[in-house]
A protein has these predicted regions:
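Amphipathic alpha-helical recognition patches that constitute DNA-binding helices
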Residues: 3, 27, 31, 217, ...
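Mid-to-C-terminal secondary-structure elements
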Residues: 118-135, 145-241
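Structured, solvent-exposed hinge/loop segments at the ends of secondary-structure elements
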Residues: 33-157, 163, 171-176, 233
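Short, strongly hydrophobic transmembrane alpha-helices
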Residues: 11-39
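Alpha-helical hydrophobic/aromatic positions enriched in membrane-embedded helices and signal peptides
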Residues: 3, 10, 17, 110, ...
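A short amphipathic helical element positioned immediately N-terminal to and/or at the very start
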Residues: 1-9, 77-81
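Alpha-solenoid HEAT/Armadillo repeat architecture
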Residues: 9-10, 221
């Protein structure tokens, strides 16, 4: 210890640089580990990651000559693959996530993260409601212009979560009625994060008539007693049909 103190007194500048550099390196490694843990561990609102299987964006082409290749799956395609999986407890389809101009009026707003989801999304992810409710089956099926927003947006626009319920909130200059307000979700959660959530059925009421190409993804929750590898095998069999 005396030798260390003597070295520090002899070379205070280099000793300080060495100590600070070591501290910064340790802090950097700890931050990376914390971010990795947050993005991979079973933490709310993505509290069942270890039981989830995620689709990729998909890739389609003509079988005859491999021409007309496209990335991305339509609702029709993703539903055909994931709808009848015996090993899946729940499947949620995620529409495209966009940055859109949003605000409490057409002339007052800013770009926000808008996520398009179905009803099962709220069963797969644990996002607590602060006020109001989630959009209903009837609203989803009827393509109603309803939206669930985060608590921060509600406070900024209307003063409180409770005051936001029933008000109009403009998404891409189109009014949508606020039916619910959730707790804010950190952007570290890849699939649960959003500032606004709306039914993807409001984007296109004729989803079943499209072709293979689109912007949908799927997240499947594995049934108890079924392994993730088994569910992946079922997905591959479904693709082969």
């Amino acid at each position: 210890m005396k030798q260390i103190l003597a070295l520090i007194r002899q070379n205070p500048f280099f000793s300080a640089v060495s100590v600070i550099g070591t501290a910064v390196s340790i802090t950097f490694v700890m931050v990376i580990y914390m971010v990795y843990d947050i993005q991979t561990a079973d933490l709310a609102p993505e509290s069942r990651r270890s039981s989830m299987v995620y689709s990729s964006y998909g890739y389609s082409y003509r079988k005859s000559d491999h021409s007309n290749s496209n990335t991305g799956m339509s609702y029709r395609a993703v539903n055909a693959i994931f709808a009848e999986l015996p090993g899946a407890e729940l499947v949620t389809y995620l529409g495209p996530t966009y940055l859109r101009y949003c605000g409490d009026s057409p002339v007052r707003g800013m770009r926000r993260t808008v996520r398009q989801v179905d009803l099962n999304y709220w069963r797969v992810y644990d996002i607590p409601l602060v006020a109001g409710r989630l959009f209903s089956t009837e609203e989803f099926d009827a393509c109603r212009d309803v939206v669930v927003i985060g608590e921060q947006l509600a406070r900024e626009a209307f003063g409180s979560a409770e005051a936001a319920i029933g008000k109009n909130y403009f998404v891409n200059f189109r009014p949508k009625r606020i039916v619910g307000v959730t707790k804010d979700v950190s952007s570290l959660f890849t699939f649960a994060y959003g500032e606004l959530w709306m039914p993807y059925s409001t984007r296109d009421s004729g989803l079943g008539s499209e072709g293979l190409r689109g912007d949908f993804e799927a997240v499947a929750l594995v049934k108890p007693g079924v392994g993730r590898e088994e569910l992946k095998r079922q997905i591959e069999q479904s693709l082969a049909r």
